[in-house]
């Protein structure tokens, strides 16, 4: 899912890198700067093209994300450029709604027609957050050394008449199939590999290095 430098892991560099502890990395500094800019209204031009996906993936947060992504993707290219500058999305979440995840994902795919999207995983990228991280432009997806990634099967709770429950199960399966299809498209995993992982019926936790290996 990731490419980067220093302690921000890349698929190509991870095979040769040594496990060394370093101070704060450049990507972590940039994430802190983007957060401060968002909170204070300050920051430079690059900060203005950064979006934070921090917290639960829910309807309120997805609206903020979608508005931000559309706004940045609709800007005009600089003189002499065919495409507008990259936008950067920092992701740190325990997950949330599959529907809102898909809404963000679809908007990111549309936006990539106009600009590349850099995604950076910081802290934790779990459940619904994994597809958002993976949806960045290939070659521009990053993850910090100590970030943890978790994937699992789609889950839901429902009560009611048996026919309603059967209908709900069909919908959950449809969401699961869509989730797998999207992850296959964005990573190096095959559909068979993903189904095998998700069929374990447990949360699958990955280190930054393992996430890189999965693509």
Describe the role of every protein-language-model region.
Residues 1-215:
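Terminal-region recognition feature
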């Amino acid at each position: 899912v990731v490419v980067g430098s220093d302690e921000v892991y890349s698929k190509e560099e991870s095979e040769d890198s040594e496990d060394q502890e370093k101070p704060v990395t450049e990507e972590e500094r940039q994430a802190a700067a983007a957060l401060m800019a968002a909170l204070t209204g300050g920051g430079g031009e690059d900060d203005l093209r950064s979006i934070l996906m921090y917290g639960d993936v829910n309807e309120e947060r997805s609206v903020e994300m979608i508005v931000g992504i559309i706004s940045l993707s609709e800007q005009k290219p600089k003189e002499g450029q065919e495409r507008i500058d990259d936008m950067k999305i920092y992701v740190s979440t325990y997950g949330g709604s599959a529907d809102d995840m898909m809404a963000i994902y679809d908007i990111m795919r549309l936006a990539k027609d106009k600009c590349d999207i850099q995604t950076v995983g910081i802290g934790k990228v779990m459940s619904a957050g994994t597809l958002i991280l993976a949806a960045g432009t290939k070659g521009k997806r990053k993850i910090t050394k100590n970030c943890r990634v978790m994937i699992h099967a789609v889950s839901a709770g429902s009560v009611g008449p048996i026919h309603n429950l059967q209908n709900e199960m069909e919908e959950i399966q449809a969401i699961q199939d869509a989730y797998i299809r999207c992850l296959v498209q964005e990573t190096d995993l095959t559909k068979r590999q993903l189904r095998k992982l998700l069929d374990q019926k447990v949360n699958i936790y990955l280190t930054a290095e393992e996430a890189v290996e999965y693509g």
